[in-house]
């Protein structure tokens, strides 16, 4: 079984070592890995200005990915509320970024500053991976990341977006929101919006099988295209990167998906093709 991991973080200030990652991937049957760039300018970065920091981390992202033959895929982590967010998005796209990562740490997804940035990204044909669910940091920001806050995507034409971690602990809310977007294709408001669910852990082991059972249940009851809108991810980091973990998680997730009722072929597509 080939593996496509859509959720691996680049450690801050890390020296790009794509060869190390590719060697580990080859050893464990991992075909492709999405690398998420270092974080935006939330705090001071060694005396750099925000623009200097953002340019530097974009350059490192491309150093991690440019020589990988398409196996390490660059996704740029952007704060859509920053004044120059659209300029950042354009620089990232010009450099070769395939999409964007957003964490709503201090703002709601539908913030007026962010919405034009989402539309700009959608117009460029790029997708957005959002953190969703409880955020394990020291901020009071859980309510920013509840799935129903992404109803704002109804107002973004052509957007493709994913909610990560099955939005744990709000997995049912995430799945319900998917159902709403699935049904939206029959609405006059439908303008090509597509929602995906990133199954990257965040869901503790006890809940993970339950979440997959719920996903299959609603799929079997008519949530359209759900089998093609689930993504596999490991939430790994480049610093201690070991594709054994990716492969082990992929095998366990495949087993859970099949236990829930998905066919072996569908489980394989979720792990390697979606």
Model-derived features: positions:
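Mid-to-C-terminal alpha-helical segments outside catalytic/metal-binding sites
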Residues: 1-9, 16-32, 90, 224-231, ...
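Active-site gating/metal-coordination segments in enzymes
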Residues: 47-144, 196, 201
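Histidine-centered divalent metal-coordination motifs
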Residues: 4-11, 131, 165
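Metal-cofactor-binding active-site regions of metalloenzymes
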Residues: 39-43, 65-82, 216-224, 228
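Divalent metal-dependent hydrolysis catalytic cores, especially in the metallo-beta-lactamase
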Residues: 8, 13, 20-47, 71-77, ...
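Acidic-and-aromatic substrate-binding clefts and catalytic sites of carbohydrate-active enzymes
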Residues: 10-18, 41-44, 50-54, 78-85, ...
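Catalytic pocket-lining loop regions of alpha/beta-barrel enzymes
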Residues: 99, 111-231
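Conserved, mostly hydrophobic/aromatic
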Residues: 7, 25, 61, 65, ...
């Amino acid at each position: 079984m080939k593996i496509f991991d859509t959720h691996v973080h680049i450690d801050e200030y890390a020296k790009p070592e794509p060869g190390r990652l590719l060697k580990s991937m080859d050893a464990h049957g991992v075909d492709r890995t999405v690398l998420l760039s270092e974080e935006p300018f939330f705090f001071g970065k060694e005396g750099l200005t925000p623009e200097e920091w953002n340019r530097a981390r974009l350059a490192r992202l491309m150093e991690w990915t440019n020589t990988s033959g398409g196996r390490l895929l660059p996704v740029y982590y952007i704060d859509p509320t920053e004044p120059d967010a659209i300029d950042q998005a354009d620089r990232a796209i010009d450099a070769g970024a395939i999409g964007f990562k957003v964490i709503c740490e201090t703002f709601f997804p539908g913030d007026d500053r962010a919405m034009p940035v989402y539309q700009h990204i959608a117009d460029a044909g790029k997708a957005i991976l959002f953190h969703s669910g409880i955020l394990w940091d020291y901020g009071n920001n859980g309510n920013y990341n509840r799935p129903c806050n992404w109803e704002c995507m109804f107002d973004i034409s052509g957007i493709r977006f994913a909610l990560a971690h099955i939005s744990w602990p709000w997995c049912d809310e995430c799945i319900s929101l998917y159902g709403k977007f699935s049904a939206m294709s029959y609405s006059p408001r439908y303008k090509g919006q597509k929602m995906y669910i990133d199954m990257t852990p965040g869901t503790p082991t006890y809940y993970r099988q339950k979440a997959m059972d719920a996903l299959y249940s609603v799929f079997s009851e008519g949530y359209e295209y759900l089998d093609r809108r689930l993504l596999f991810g490991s939430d790994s980091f480049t610093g201690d990167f070991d594709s054994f973990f990716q492969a082990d998680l992929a095998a366990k997730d495949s087993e859970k998906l099949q236990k829930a009722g998905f066919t072996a072929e569908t489980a394989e597509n979720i792990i390697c093709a979606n």
